[in-house]
């Protein structure tokens, strides 16, 4: 719960899930009432993400956060979006516009059109400013 809340604060979200359930190796979900015993559950509700060394959000959570106006966002064009989805970082000059208070060291959602394709940390790399890829939707494809 602590890592999830920290992530939500970092991206500027006002969303705070109320009922959380820890099932299957620290995967958080918004719970749904079911009559199964807890030890027999595999999933229950909307998958929000997983605790590792930091919180790794699900693509469903990222899409939910993308609908909020307060969330920090960086909008990119098609070529930069493709590079981000295959695991590359985005240079600041490839960002069309920022929404919200995106400063060096802060986290933001990376948007292509109205869809969120991941999130990253806005930082410097050498003499350039980049959005370092922390998670993208291509992660699921690379795992297979």
Model regions: which residues?
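Polybasic, low-complexity RNA-engagement segments
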Residues: 1-144
